[in-house]
Amino acid sequence: MSSYENHQALDGLTLGKSTDYRDNYDVSLLQGVPRSLNRDPLGLTADNLPFHGADIWTLYELSWLNSQGLPQVAVGHVELDYTSVNLIESKSFKLYLNSFNQTRFDTWETVRQTLERDLRACAQGNVSVRLHRLDELEGQPVAHFHGACIDDQDISIDNYQFTTDYLQHAVSGEKQVEETLVSHLLKSNCLITHQPDWGSIQIQYRGRKIDREKLLRYLVSFRHHNEFHEQCVERIFNDILRFCQPETLSIYARYTRRGGLDINPWRSNTDFVPATGRLARQ
């Protein structure tokens, strides 16, 4: 359970409540969640963040009417900057996108600009939006995370409660290594509804070698943990940086789709360019 799970800032969210679906444009449906909710307990403030990054969203269920009333469909790519005051709550994002369904827009660019303007206002930060026609995406191969997968270990696990204990004394030797580790066993739960969130995670670092068994046990300990995707990624970054003290660190997670949206946050303190291809479970 997160320390801020019952925070008053979450009281007004539609998440976890019965809601009506609207099919005419309504920007009021968008809701933000302050990033400070999870950053404050981690000792992170806007002027001392140890990372840069973004939350990458893929919008698979985006449709509207053109000026003649003919339905249009697109796949959207949204990048929400890590410096924004708020993250975007995903159910409200879905409801907001549904409100485009019976709304007429003159051009695709008008749709893109509308999305960008509204998301920036809700997040109180920088947002970029791209729209793709379906034929631009057809035939794209399923991507994979580059790196060594740490999942196939012959170990017994019986603790699924979140703890950073596994990261204590998780590095060994004085030699500096540079490696990329991958796990597909990341599972946490929605902060509000406690529905499961499934993800794959890529951890790229340079520093003293991290024990792979301890790292995997740490990741598995998220299994009963309740936080949003973005918050989990920042927690993982902060914990590894604190306990393992790598010189450079990049964390990138790609989560499975829900409600026509997938969320793929990344955080890094070095040069890092996230690959945006969908993984096998996306």
Swiss-Prot record:
UniProt keyword list: Cytoplasm, NADP, Oxidoreductase, Queuosine biosynthesis
GO MF annotation terms: preQ1 synthase activity
Keyword NADP: yes
Pathway assigned to this chain's UniProt record: tRNA modification; tRNA-queuosine biosynthesis
GO CC, one annotated term: cytoplasm
Annotated catalysed reactions: 7-aminomethyl-7-carbaguanine + 2 NADP(+) = 7-cyano-7-deazaguanine + 2 NADPH + 3 H(+)
Catalytic residue list: 190, 197
UniProt-listed Enzyme Commission number(s): 1.7.1.13
InterPro entries the record matches: GTP-CH-I_C/QueF (IPR043133), NADPH_dep_7-cyano-7-deazaG_red (IPR050084), QueF (IPR029500), QueF_N (IPR029139), QueF_type2 (IPR016428)
Entry binding sites for NADPH: 90-91, 258-259
UniProt GO BP: queuosine biosynthetic process; tRNA modification
RNA-binding as UniProt keyword: no
Localisation per UniProt entry: Cytoplasm
The protein, known as: NADPH-dependent 7-cyano-7-deazaguanine reductase
Lineage of the organism: Bacteria, Pseudomonadati, Pseudomonadota, Gammaproteobacteria, Enterobacterales
Gene: queF
